Structure formats: C-alpha cells, structure tokens
Amino acid sequence: MMVVLLGATTLVLVAVAPWVLSAAAGGKNLKSPQKVEVDIIDDNFILRWNRSDESVGNVTFSFDYQKTGMDNWIKLSGCQNITSTKCNFSSLKLNVYEEIKLRIRAEKENTSSWYEVDSFTPFRKAQIGPPEVHLEAEDKAIVIHISPGTKDSVMWALDGLSFTYSLVIWKNSSGVEERIENIYSRHKIYKLSPETTYCLKVKAALLTSWKIGVYSPVHCIKTTVENELPPPENIEVSVQNQNYVLKWDYTYANMTFQVQWLHAFLKRNPGNHLYKWKQIPDCENVKTTQCVFPQNVFQKGIYLLRVQASDGNNTSFWSEEIKFDTEIQAFLLPPVFNIRSLSDSFHIYIGAPKQSGNTPVIQDYPLIYEIIFWENTSNAERKIIEKKTDVTVPNLKPLTVYCVKARAHTMDEKLNKSSVFSDAVCEKTKPGNTSKIWLIVGICIALFALPFVIYAAKVFLRCINYVFFPSLKPSSSIDEYFSEQPLKNLLLSTSEEQIEKCFIIENISTIATVEETNQTDEDHKKYSSQTSQDSGNYSNEDESESKTSEELQQDFV
C-alpha cells in the first residue's frame, strides 16, 4: 500500500514541475527562435534570426556548434547571450571545407528548446564580396587596379589566382551602361574620349566553383586632356623565315619607337606589374614603324606587347596591348598524310607535320584540313574540308590514278592562319567488284574448257603423227600369212583395198552361177578400172578371182 502511494506522489511531482518552472518565468513558456539564416561573404560569417514572441522582453540568444565527427556541442564564440537578432562569428577559426552544425535557443531565467540549423559547408555557402577598385586616368584610357575585398582571405586562399572580373562602364552624362568587358586585375580600358567623366563598377567571379560575386560601389573618374602625341595603333606580328616582324601605324614622321613585352600570366596575379615590362632587343629607339627580332628571343608561351612613340621632347602613352602567342604566330607547317587505296575511295590518315630532326610538331590549337584531289589525267579539282584526321574521299573510279594534296587552317577565325599545301601524292585505285566478277568467270570458263582443249590437242597430234609419221609395214615373209591388207591412209588417195572372198559351191549349177557372177563382177570391175587412178590393183584382183574360179572347178570335179 505504501508503494502505491509513493508512486502516485512521484507522478504528481513530475506533472507539477513544468508548471512550477513556468510560474517562475512569469507564467509563460519561451519559444525557440525561427528562420535562422547564415550569410557568409568572403571571411565574414553573419547569423540572423527572428524572435518567436516579441511580447517577451529581456530575452537573450545563444548558439552552439558541432563539427563532423563530434558528439558534444561547443559554445559559439561571439554568439552568446546576444540581445539582438544578429551576431558575427568571423573570429571563429573554422576549416571552411568542413561541414558544421548550428543550434540556437532563447534564454530568460529559463530556456527554450534548441532550434537546429541545417548543416552546411562554409566554402559552398560563401559568396564573393565586392572587390576594391582604384582608377588612373589618361587622355583616351582608364587604368584599373582591382584587389580582393578581403586581404589575405582564408575563404579564397586556394583560389586567389582563379578570379575573373567583369566591368560595366558608362559616361556619367548619359547614365546608360555602354560597355561590359572581362578584364584582368590590372587592366586598361581604351578608346575613350578626352576630358570626359566615366563611371564603372566591377564584380568578381570564380568560374571553377560557379560563384558570381556582387558589384563594387560605383567609381567615377574624368579622363585627361588629349596628349600631343597619340599612341601607336594597329600593331601586328608576322613571321618571316626565322624572325618575327612587328609592325604598327603612326600619324607623324621622324619619330622614335620602343617596344616592351610582359608574360601574359602575370596579368592574372594581383599586384603591380609596372616594373616587370622588358625591352625587346633590336626594338629600342627604332626610327621606322617596324622592327625585326629573332624567334629565339621568346620561349614557348603567351606574351603581351606594347609600343610607345617619342619625338625627343614628348612621349606618347603606351599603345593598346596585344596578345602574342608564339605557337600561333609560328609558321604553320603543312600536314603529313598517308593514303590507303580502295576500289572506289581513298582513306586518308593525317598526322602531325615533322620539323628538323624528324620530330613531330605539337600544336596546342585546333585545326581543320583542306584536302584537294583530282584525276592524274585531268585538271578538274575537288575539295573536302574536314576537322577529323581520318578522312574518306568517296566516289572514285576503279583502276584510276588520283593525286591528293592538303593544308591546315586554324579553326579560330581571329587567328586566320593557314599552311602551304603539302606535296601532291598520287595513288591508283584498286579494281572494282565488276572486274573481279569477270575475272572469276573467265577463270571458271578456262577451267571448264581445259579438258576439251587437251582432248582436241591429243586428237590433232594423232592425226599429225598418222599423216606424217606412219607405222612401218611388216616384211613380205610375215605379210604372206595375212590375207587382210593393212588399212590405207584415209586422208590420201589410195587404191581400193583387197578383200578376201569366200565361196560355197553346192552343185554344178552353182558353179555356173558363180561363173556368171564372176563374169558380171569382171565386167563391173573393168568399168570401174576406167575411172580409177590405180587400175593395176583391179587387174590384179581380176586375175586372182579367175584363178580362184578355176581352182574351184577342179576341186568340184
């Protein structure tokens, strides 16, 4: 019974405790702050939030933070017992690439429940602040010096050289934004009017992280009075043999010029590069509007060039800087290619051109190839433009000689560079499918006719041997045992062959019949002997037959 009462008493105390705390706080429960926002600009970390109950006064707010891998919460320095709805915790040394969590609560004698902010990574949430801008005026140009808004920024320590800047400039009198340019941290805006006020604003961007900053405050400056000597214009660089030729235009004669160069990558680095410009050998104090210097003056790379004019008393401002790429300005060599011939097409494989020492030339800019081909017996040319290095030339005739030549062009129209044509290479296409079919048919016919040809040849040889090389006759001693004479040559005119005749005599009347028959045969043979060429043979035969008749009569008697 005591246990039951004790349990009931405990339940009552637990239920009453919140009521007691609420009464101690003035009879109201504190609510957690809402809509907490984290704003990070460069290295400045700002927290903002809203009160849940404006009617409750003298309420303070405190923040805790927690890093990844931590179990406990740590008080956020600079954001403890804050009476306003904003606090700055920039003094906290955080790893800007490490994820953190924040939580906030309201406090007045008692405390509200914690309100947790979604975890975030400072670098991803940070924005690029407005850069600092310093201006210098010339008569037709403005020199701009840009530096980060926060010096030695921790947030952008690894990306200081990756910033790009964009500029918006306009005449102050018009108020219309005229030009938008991408610029370096040290830049010069050309083609302005003298004694004119221009206003501009600049913002930074970090393209590698897809971050766009906010614009700087507007800065205005007035250009100076026009200088007596204008700067040189229209600067161009060309290649002749193993030298660079630098040319420019100028209004006045009897002037002296000098040319300077600077590594282009230095423009991306913050700082003053005024004293890093260097003179080009053979281009100092020249009296003409051009200068020539050897290619070995510059190693492979990108440079900036500028020219200045002087008459001995006055000096012009520096000309507009031009970009000079040794790879692009170098002489563009013709391509090297190999041809694989088919029956109705060529496969052309294009390779890098070769320089002295048979080493390939490495080209860091994209090229397109112009291929011209024609029949060796004709002057009608056809042209193909290809970006690929594996090109097929279709619709060719079988067993025909075609010639091919090629040259390279830069794809960038601003460069407008082309090589000379390569030497022409001539190749003969292979036989077509029709020729192969006829060849196969011819072989089959020849194989089929071969036995007949062999047989006909054998027969012909036998005839030749039989006519011109007959077999020898047997001797007279052997020949008398054979009554049948050998076959005569059918192709030559010969006497009639002798035929052995046999008679069967049954009675005397038969003998008379035989005699009559013999007489008839004799008359017929005599008639035939008049038309025969060999009459001697028939007379021999008659004698033989008459003898035979007499012998038969004697045998019968």
Curated annotation (Swiss-Prot):
Effect of residue 24 to V: No effect on activation of STAT1 upon IFNA2 or IFNG binding
Residues of this chain annotated as glycosylated in UniProt: 50, 58, 81, 88, 110, 172, 254, 313-314, 376, 416, 433
Effect the entry attributes to changing residue 169 to M: No effect on activation of STAT1 upon IFNA2 or IFNG binding
Residues the record lists as Phosphotyrosine modifications: 466, 481
Lipidation (S-palmitoyl cysteine): 463
Effect of residue 307 to I: No effect on activation of STAT1 upon IFNA2 or IFNG binding
Effect of residue 80 to H: No effect on activation of STAT1 upon IFNA2 or IFNG binding IFNG binding
Extracellular compartment residues: 28-436
Region of interest (Important for interaction with TYK2), residue spans: 491-500
Protein name according to UniProt: Interferon alpha/beta receptor 1
Protein species of origin: Homo sapiens
